[in-house]
Design a protein with these regions (language model features):
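Catalytic domains of carbohydrate-active enzymes, especially glycoside hydrolases
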Residues: 158-167
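Catalytic core of soluble alpha/beta enzymes
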Residues: 176-315
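Active-site mouth loops of central-metabolism enzymes
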Residues: 136-151, 170-172, 198-209, 253
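Structured beta-strand/loop patches that form or line metal/cofactor-binding pockets in enzymes
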Residues: 1-45, 54
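Conserved, mostly hydrophobic/aromatic
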Residues: 46, 70, 109, 122, ...
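N-terminal small/glycine-rich loop or linker at the start of catalytic domains
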Residues: 121-145, 271
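Metal- or metallocofactor-binding catalytic centers and their adjacent structured scaffolds
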Residues: 42-120
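Predominant activation on well-ordered alpha-helical scaffold segments within soluble catalytic domains
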Residues: 64-71, 106, 110, 114-115, ...
Length: 319
C-alpha cells in the first residue's frame, strides 16, 4: 500500500506540422500546434506516475478542471488499489458524464496509477496485468491527409525508410481517383493501404450506401487490396457498420470514440467489426482495454489499440 499524496494536471503544447499542411488548414484553426493533457500522481513513497487523457488534445482546460474536481476524492487513499480508485472516480463523475469527457480524465488517472504502481514494483506496466505473449507489435503509418502526389510520395518514402509496411490514409467518397492512385503507388513500395473515413467527425456522416459505391468505384480503377475501412459510417450507425461488414470484403473497424467497456462489448456482441479499436486514454484506462480484449477473444474479433495522443497515451496502449 502507498497512499496518494498529490494529483496535478499538466497541459503541454508543442509545434505540430506545417501551417500550410492540409490537416492543419482543415482541423487546426489555431495553427500548427497540438496540446495534450497529462496527470501526475505522486504517492507517499515518492514515486510519480503519469497518465494521459485524449480530451486534452481537444479541450485542455476542460481536462484540467475535471482533474482538479476529482483529485480531493482520491488524495489520502491507497494508490495501489487501482480498481477501487477507478470506482471512486466513477462515483464522482458518472452521474453527469457516464460517457464522454470525464471518461477521458478517469482514463488519465487510472493510467497514472498503473504507472506509479509498476514503477514501485520495478516492473513494466504490462506485468501488472499478467504477462505478454508477444515481444513486438506491428505499427502502421497514420497520415494520408495529402493534396498532392508529391506529398503522398514523401510519406511513402518515410514509411519505407522506417520499415513500416502499412499506411493509413484519410479519404471520403469523392476521393475515388485519389484513393486508386495511392493504392497503386503504395504497391511500388510494398506498402498496404487502409482507409480512415473519419465519420466520427462528420455531421451528418455518410451512409453505408455511399461507402459501398465509393469502394466499388475505386475497385473499377485499382485491383489492389484495401486492408481496412475505419470509422466508415457515423459512430451511432450500428446497422451501417453491419451492412459494410456483410457487403464488402474489407475488414471493417471502429470504436476509438467509445468511452466505456460496456458499450464496446455491446458492439462486439452485435458483430459489427472485424477488428475493434479501444483507446486506453478514452475508454477508462488500461484495465478497461484489457476487459475489451478479453471479450473480443470470445467473439474471435481482433483488438487493435488506437492511440493518437501524446507519448504517455501511446505507451499506455502499447502496454
Amino acid at each position: 500500500m502507498s497512499k496518494i499524496e498529490n494529483i496535478r494536471p499538466i497541459l503541454l503544447t508543442a509545434d505540430y506540422g506545417d501551417e500550410k499542411h492540409p490537416e492543419i488548414l482543415e482541423c487546426f484553426p489555431n495553427g500548427p500546434k497540438r496540446t495534450i493533457g497529462l496527470v501526475e500522481v505522486t504517492l507517499e513513497n515518492g514515486v510519480k506516475g503519469y497518465g494521459e487523457g485524449y480530451l486534452g488534445v481537444f479541450a485542455p482546460n476542460v481536462f484540467k478542471s475535471i482533474i482538479e474536481l476529482c483529485s480531493p476524492y482520491l488524495v489520502g487513499k491507497d494508490g495501489f488499489d487501482i480498481l477501487r480508485r477507478y470506482k471512486d472516480l466513477c462515483s464522482v463523475c458518472d452521474y453527469w458524464s457516464l460517457q464522454g469527457a470525464a471518461r477521458h480524465t478517469t482514463s488519465a488517472i487510472e493510467i497514472a496509477l498503473v504507472d506509479a504502481k509498476s514503477k514501485t514494483q520495478k516492473c513494466p506496466a504490462y506485468k501488472l496485468f499478467g504477462n505478454s505473449s508477444k515481444d513486438q507489435i506491428e505499427t502502421y503509418g497514420s497520415g494520408g491527409i495529402c493534396d498532392t502526389k508529391e506529398h503522398f510520395i514523401e510519406e511513402l518514402e518515410l514509411l519505407k525508410s522506417l520499415g513500416i509496411k502499412k499506411y493509413k490514409i484519410r479519404s471520403v467518397p469523392n476521393d475515388i481517383n485519389r484513393t486508386a492512385w495511392v493504392l497503386k503507388e503504395a504497391r511500388k513500395y510494398g506498402i498496404d493501404i487502409g482507409i480512415d473515413m473519419c465519420q466520427n467527425l462528420a455531421d451528418p456522416p455518410i451512409s453505408a450506401d455511399d461507402v459501398i459505391s465509393y469502394i466499388n468505384s475505386v475497385k473499377k480503377i485499382s485491383k489492389e487490396k484495401i486492408l481496412f475501412l475505419e470509422e466508415a459510417v457515423g459512430p451511432m450507425d450500428i446497422n451501417g457498420f453491419k451492412r459494410l461488414k456483410e457487403t464488402l470484403k474489407i475488414a471493417i473497424c471502429g470504436g476509438e470514440v467509445i468511452t466505456t467497456p460496456l458499450e464496446m462489448i455491446q458492439r462486439l456482441n452485435l458483430d459489427i467489426y472485424n477488428f475493434v479499436q479501444p483507446d486506453a486514454s478514452v475508454i477508462g484506462g488500461m484495465h478497461a482495454v484489457k476487459e475489451v480484449f478479453e471479450h473480443a477473444k470470445t467473439k474471435k474479433i481482433i483488438p487493435v489499440v488506437h492511440a493518437w495522443g501524446g507519448p504517455v497515451a501511446i505507451m499506455a496502449n502499447y502496454h
